[in-house]
């Protein structure tokens, strides 16, 4: 007996790990948030630039996040001309290529902002995605620390434009040269120690995640993720001695951080005080340069009302020696924006968001293409992370914007209904014709309109058509009727308001009145 042919298996619909779909509500919230960021960046004189998602892999270079070799940490493929191309892992490396390629045509300093998706070929985990959004601003061709100070001020202004009050965020600033100077003092200067220096930087960069004793393991022989030997993955450390590790931990100590002033301005230390404390951690030219640059930044911040002083206890930007940033290409001042808000997620669990943006000076990135010094500094906001925070604190809505006005259909002749839709659209009203099964009942079409979050629906049966009128059903008010069932008089009154008729030539005006009454506006 012949075997029965097997049914072909259905393809399983599934999303790759570390990626996420987004719906209308989230997209609308992103759009609102991005517009506010854009307004601040443009107020500072930055202009938009777009670069492709793909770059030649060698243009991205060795500056890959948490990796020491090209092609690791990025998604790459070989083109038909046998050249390797990769999805961008941030928006800074592509900008460096863009500026280098168009160097003679661009004004210097070149000031631009960019917004888009970036991609990381890393192990995904909770809150760690392989694709996420960033919004960057960069100044290329400005050699002084004034450009870095401006980035910090702009970061503070952006947080406040997004509805985060002073005291609920802080912009933290440091200088890579300060830590480099400390590393030189313990014998880790020179190119031959570049790998160990980077391991130290990445260990200190995890200070917000791990306790000091865990950081010390990363500075020493290494750390097991499981908490004890043999458990979990092993991260090799920088192999520093205990004395060397102690000096590094002391130089990046939170006790140096400016601020902690009383309401009357007493107590606390200023940013300038912090710089002077840092000068005492080592005695070499590298550390001196770093502290001199931080002093310039501190003076500018104080002059503009952003710094930590006794006259300005409401601190917006502080010098914090624990900030190092994990990317290798930073060469000078580095900065980070941290949210100080404690909130709860949808399940009532406490959430502390921490860093939502950062950046720094990268004087060597454009220079790779030019063979000459090209100073640059930039700031990047993690849009996805910041959006999650703003949604939880109520500064961004998590509801979709109103859907279109739905024109329902009766019978096979749809030309008249399509004309209604066209009339509404010409008046600037979002509208659509119900294009589902033409045999669907009015009730089924209303269910569709509800799912579309429509503010109202247009109904015209054969009787209304003969009279030249339409019925307008207020779906927002209709949804509220259930809460009025105990108050019969009010219920009947609102029920009458929830559906009314008008002449066809009055339809647009009546819909506009309803939308205004319900506060419906499409962004």
From Swiss-Prot:
In alphabetical order, the GO MF annotations are:
ATP binding; histidine-tRNA ligase activity
Q: By its UniProt entry, which CDD domains does this protein fall under?
A: HisRS-like_core
Which top class of enzyme applies to this chain?
A: ligase
Report the subcellular localization.
Cytoplasm
GO terms (BP aspect): histidyl-tRNA aminoacylation
Q: Which UniProt keywords apply?
A: Aminoacyl-tRNA synthetase, ATP-binding, Cytoplasm, Ligase, Nucleotide-binding, Protein biosynthesis
State the EC number(s).
6.1.1.21
Task: Report one GO cellular component.
Answer: cytoplasm
User: According to its UniProt record, where is this protein mainly located?
Assistant: cytoplasm
Q: Which residues form a coiled coil?
A: none
- Catalytic activity, per the record? tRNA(His) + L-histidine + ATP = L-histidyl-tRNA(His) + AMP + diphosphate + H(+)
Pfam families according to UniProt = HGTP_anticodon (PF03129), tRNA-synt_His (PF13393)
Q: Which NCBIfam families match?
A: hisS
Q: How does it assemble?
A: Homodimer.
Q: Which family does it belong to?
A: Belongs to the class-II aminoacyl-tRNA synthetase family.
HAMAP family assigned to the protein according to its UniProt record, in alphabetical order: His_tRNA_synth (MF_00127)
Q: What is this protein called?
A: Histidine--tRNA ligase
Which gene does this sequence derive from? Answer: hisS
